[in-house]
Amino acid sequence: MNLTKEYILSCYDKTKRLAKKSFEKGRYNRSLKYINIAARIAYQFNWIYRDDDLEELLANISKQTISKRNHYTPIENRYVLYVASMIDNRGEIQQYLRALIACEGELLVIVEKYGKEAAATIAEIKAYPKAKIYALQGDETDVESNAQKLYDKIVNFRPSKLFMHLRPESGFAITVFDALPEEIINYQINLTDHAFWLGCKCLDYIFEFRPYGCTVSQEKRKIDKDKILLLPYYPILNHRDFQGFPSSCTADKIILFSGGELYKIYGGNGLYFKIVKHILDENPQAILLYAGDGDTGGVNAFIAENKYENRFILLGFRQDINEVFKHCDIYLCTYPSAGGLMCQYAAVNGKPILAYNEPKARSKFIEDLICVNANVQLTFTDPKRLTEEAGRLITDKTYRKKQGKKQTKKGARK
């Protein structure tokens, strides 16, 4: 089935209507689920950045499910960090956690869910004597049963500041944050600056990690400029044992690596796949490995059509991501959505970066992430020049090493 824009918009509008109808019938859990579905649609297809209808519905659900305190006195240097999904080396959790620990205040970390994939982060929290961890129990979308519990947990802790690390569809958390006393200052940690998310109305300030996000939040999300704080982040270089590469990655092969959620390479008239095809067809010694989650259908179809079964290989999620970069030769940036953290890992490890974007999209160039204070150009605006550069990097080891060191020296943050 071909997903047309008209069909996507009709599904979105229908889901919003179902959310409103459920609310009017007092079925708040169901209303919240429809809100989250609508948010996921908007996030996946990325035609809007804010929806005040959904924001208003969340605020109304909050009023119906939470009894607010009449008086509240915050305690300074007491903070809450709310994490929707905790995974090591993903998002900006560890960066902000370390910053809050450095403030030497009391810290309550609230997590919707976590497992062994968050072992390093949990260890850091437990090692800090002033920190507590609270994991939500049951279904986090059960607003009727759990919203009041979470509200009471936060208010009883009496924080002065709340830091929100959310998913685009974190409707449950936002219903609680909407009800919090105004004495608590809410900071949104925006790890999804390129797409839609819920929560524009419940923040006091928003942390952006690059100028592009500042522009989107001001112009598209309609957030006041005075509330937007630019704070670049750095990759967390945890050591993990290398999990290895597929057997086809023999010593005579040049390993290109690419990574990020798979939606980042869909769209853009299929240009990412055209670039990959040109590189692999012109350079038989090259193999492309891709680490990331998402809908694999489009990638698998591309692999089968071009008989790339041993040359374009999906790795899934890799916790040893820094080791992956150490063992690859070249990093190929995603398109049409460029990944920030992956580019930083490449730069820190001295791997040359191949990045493309349209000339008119300079706000999305990766230079804003790894070369802020240096006059260096990494992003290509001509696909042909990029593939030519790829060929030279693949065939000339000395040049490849030189380019990797050059970008690290000129601007990559360590």
Model-inferred region functions:
Residues 164-170:
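Short His-centered aromatic/hydrophobic patch
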Residues 152, 317-329, 348:
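Short acidic alpha-helix that forms the nucleotide-activated donor recognition element
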Residues 35-51, 196-228, 301:
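A short, active-site helix/loop in glycosyltransferases that binds the activated sugar's phosphate group
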Residues 157-162, 326-339, 351:
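Acidic donor-binding loop of glycosyltransferase active sites
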Residues 140-147, 293-297, 312-324, 338-339:
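Conserved active-site histidine-acidic residue motif and adjacent donor-binding/catalytic loop
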Residues 2-131:
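N-terminal subdomain of nucleotide-sugar transferases
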Residues 89-100, 211-305, 314:
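Conserved catalytic-core segment of nucleotide-activated headgroup transferases in glycan assembly
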